[in-house]
Amino acid sequence: SGGEFDEFDLNAFFEATGGYKKSRFNHKSDVQKWLDIIRGQYAPKHTEFLKTGTRPPFPYSDARLLPYLQHSFWFLPNVAACYAMANLLAEKHNVFWHEYRVIVAAGAEAGIGLDALPPVRKAIGNGFDTKTITLSCGKLTTGVTVSQWSSILMLRNLKSPETYFQAAFRVQSPWSIKNPNGDNPNEEEILKRSASGKIDDRRREFGGVSAVAGTDGPVFSL
């Protein structure tokens, strides 16, 4: 990221220690606040919104953005952060996030290269009646097409623009089904169109906590 966000270190914010199921964020309370914020449920902000009469379009609460978040990809700094996020999302008080099947596509347990893909496809299924969050720190960010992915959260520092764009392109492939009603083999229902690739077009439209970019495959970053 750039500009006013240069001083914010995503890798430090999402720093975690411990292995796999024991992994925890070093700034767990702050990450929890962030999880509450992106769904518009952070209590101190509610008072502010009431006073100002405005409410930013938080990703997991805004009706315009929710359709893009049924199947999302969260790009984190490292394996420990991926497992720490999975552990935090699974905690009892995070009831909202229990609606989502969380897949950790990171570390040795996820396998090498494309070996990490089958668990993702299995969790997504047909994509209609499931919700998923794929956590990764690099796996499945190149050479992979999962048509149901429609958003990516950039939760790490990226020095290379190529890495940013390669990851962003993971959520820009089209998603359609043929013969959706079973009575017309020539009919095709488009559920997600291919994005234009203009990654910065909408960055100014949604400011604040979530900077949104892209068209049919939005990119969220702090």
Regions found by a protein language model. Give the residues of each.
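Short helix/loop capping segments that flank catalytic or ligand/cofactor-binding pockets
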Residues: 1, 83-84, 163
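Interdomain helical connector at the RecA1-RecA2 junction of SF1/SF2 helicase-like NTPases
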Residues: 1-71
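"Short basic amphipathic alpha-helical interaction patches in structured regions
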Residues: 4-9, 75, 86-90, 117-121, ...
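Short alpha-helical segments and helix-capping/turn motifs at coil-helix boundaries
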Residues: 56-60, 86-87, 137-139
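Conserved strand-helix element at the start of the C-terminal RecA-like helicase core
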Residues: 62-90
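Short loop/turn segments immediately following beta-strands, especially the blade-tip
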Residues: 92-95
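Conserved RecA-like P-loop NTPase helicase motor core
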Residues: 97, 101-222
